[in-house]
Amino acid sequence: YAVSPWTRNGGVFTEHAAHESQIMFLEEWSKAVGKGFHTKEINPWRRAQFSNLVNMLDFSYHDGSVLKLDEVPEASKDPITDQYNGADVCALKFRSDVQPTVPYNNTEAQSLRVEKGYKPVRGNLTEGHYLTFEKDGKALQHKGHKLSLTNACNDHDGKDMRFVLWWQGKNPKDNAFYISTADKHDRKYIASSLELTTKEKAAQFSIADLGNGKGHVITEIDSGKQLSVEKDGCVALTKNASDAFKVFSVTF
C-alpha cells in the first residue's frame, strides 16, 4: 500500500517490484530534494529490472483531505504489568478455536471468489488482469473481426471490452505482450492489421504508462506504430500518435 496525497484513488499498480524498489524510490525522492544518494548494494540487473515505484504517484492530481477512519478499541493491556496482552486475551476468548479450521469441501469457485468492480491502472502493465482501454468516453472492443470502438460504460466491464495480456518477454521489464479477447473458449488475438486472429498470427505490443495521469500508449512493436483513434472514429496504427488510453482492471 502507498498512502500519499498523490496516490488517492490510484487503483491498481502492477509493475514488477521487490524490496529494492523501496530503496530506489528513496533514491529518486532524495534526488528531487537535492540530496541524492546511490545505493551500491543493489546489483545492476535488479536495478534495471525492478520498479522504482515512482509511477504509483500522479503529480497532476493532489488530494490532501483528511481521511475519516473508523473508531477502533484501544489495545488490551495487563492491569498489573501495563504490558500489551492481546495474544493472551485472544487465546482466552476463543479457547480451543485459536487456529483456523482447515477449509475442507470448499470448491474452486468459492476459494477464487473476488468482488465485482473495477480500478484504474497506474504504471506499466503485467499479466493477470482483465483490462479495458478507454479514451474520451469510448472503449476498445473486439466485437466482430477487427478492433473497433464502442461507448464506454460506467462499470468498464462490457463483455466485448475486456482484454487479456500475454507476456512475451524474458526479463521483468521486457514490455512485449500479445493482446487477446477474454473469452477462453473462443480466444482471439490482435494482429498487426488490428484484425482478430489466431495466436500464431498475433502481433506483439508494448504498453507504456506516460505517467501523471496521462494514460498508456499502445505500440505495435514490429512497425513502431501506435494505436490511435482517428477523426472518423476508427482505430488505426499511426506514427507518433498522441492518443493515450485510460486502463481499467476489471472483475466481473
Model-derived segments and spans:
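Long, His/Glu/Asp-enriched segments that create or flank divalent metal/ion-associated functional microenvironments
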Residues: 67-130, 135-137, 146-162
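Substrate-binding rim/cap in mid-to-C-terminal beta-strand-loop elements of soluble/periplasmic
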Residues: 1-29
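Extracellular glycan-recognition/adhesion modules and their associated mucin-like linkers
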Residues: 103-145, 164-194, 207-233, 249-252
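Polar, surface-exposed loop/tail segments
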Residues: 33-70
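Short, tandemly repeated low-complexity microdomains enriched for cysteine and small residues
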Residues: 143-160, 191-205, 230-243
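Substrate-binding/catalytic groove segments of enzymes
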Residues: 8-11, 31-39, 226
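Extracellular low-complexity, O-glycosylation-prone Ser/Thr/Pro/Gly-rich "stalks"
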Residues: 89-92, 102, 242-252
